[in-house]
Structures are given as structure tokens and as C-alpha cells.
Amino acid sequence: MGLKNINFFPTDHMKQNLAYMHERAPDGKLSIRPAGHLLRKPLTAKTPEEIKSTFNAGGAGCFAKPAEYAQIIATLLNDGVHAKSGNRILKKETVDQMFTNQIPEFPDFGRQGIDPPKLDLSNPLPELYPQGDLPQGWGLTFFLHQHPGPTGRSGTTGWWAGLPNLFWWADREQGLGGIIASQIVPFGDGAVMGLWGTVEAGLYQALQR
């Protein structure tokens, strides 16, 4: 895929362009987070021993340039083929399986909220993606819808989020996906989530023109 800026251990070049971690106070003001980045060890690990002793979580911990992360989303939309290079990264059946609900017997699993949270890391969220009492699903790697969302996304859309208020989605049915990326805690920031909804809804509206 030719991606240069995605890594669990940022290169020196990536560190030079690293966005500062911010936090929003209860009064709405933003400031640089005094404790620094949420993941300090990958940023400071240099020796083979330090790197080996660093835990890389499967669902979090990747540093990336949003434009390059978007190419991964586009590859999922294109049934596993990286459109820019024409290289097949995943088999279509693998992508199909990723977007198949693996836990139909647990329709409420995905809606488990964050309450009470650690207030320096997350706002209270009763649900991650409120849809009333409609069943929701979970693929091999992300939250899966079973019904259309209010922005226009299809009922087969996959999506997930990162703690510093990063939100991505991939709607294979309509061939549309994207990412909203910030470096702001706590999670569930109203301004960022509002921007996410506005941008996503605008894209779907543009498709209908």
C-alpha cells in the first residue's frame, strides 16, 4: 500500500509531526494535556528490549496519519483491494467475514455504554451509538449496524472509535467511508461527535444529488 506513517512505534519523522494531546475542561476550554500523550511508552521506546517490553493492544495503540488510515478504510470498501496501487491486501471473503455479525445472539452487546467512566478519559455515555431498541452487531474487528443510521449510513456499516475522539466508518453498501480524527480527551467530546455527524450526513446527502 506504500503507507509510510502508520506504526505502533512512531518513526522519528512521525514524531516530528505528532499532534499534541489536548483535554477539554468542564467549561469547554481546550488545553494541552499536562500528562502528555496517552501512549508514552511507544514514543520513548528505543532499544530492542524496550520495544519488546511494550504491550501493543490489538484494538488500540496505532499511530497514523489520518489520510493514510483512510486508505485502509477505502481498501475495505473495495473488497480488500488497495485502489491506488491495485494490490490485493485481503481476500474478498475475508472482508465479507469481517462485516458479518459474529454474535447475533447478543443484539445489545455493542450498545454497552461507559458509565461511570474515568472522567479524565471519557464522558459518561449510556450508549456508543444510540438506535433505540434496534439490534446491533459485532464483526471480527468492529461494531456492526443491523439497521440504517440517522446520518444515512446503511444497515451493514462497520465503525469504531479511538479514545482521543477519533471516529471512522465503512459503508460497503454505499461505497462510502471516512474518519474524523482529533487528539482530545475525554472521549465522547460533544464538539467532535457533532462534527462527525455533520460531516457524515453531508457526504450522504451529496451522494443523493
Which positions does each model-derived feature cover?
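Short, glycine/acidic-rich beta->alpha junctions
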Residues: 54, 159-162
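Short, surface-exposed loop or secondary-structure junction motifs
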Residues: 1-149
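Short, surface-exposed beta-strand/loop micro-motifs that present aromatic residues
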Residues: 164-173
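Active-site-proximal beta-strand/loop segments in catalytic clefts of secreted hydrolases
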Residues: 162, 181-183
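Generic C-terminus detector
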Residues: 184-209
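Short hydrophobic-aromatic micro-motifs
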Residues: 168, 177-180
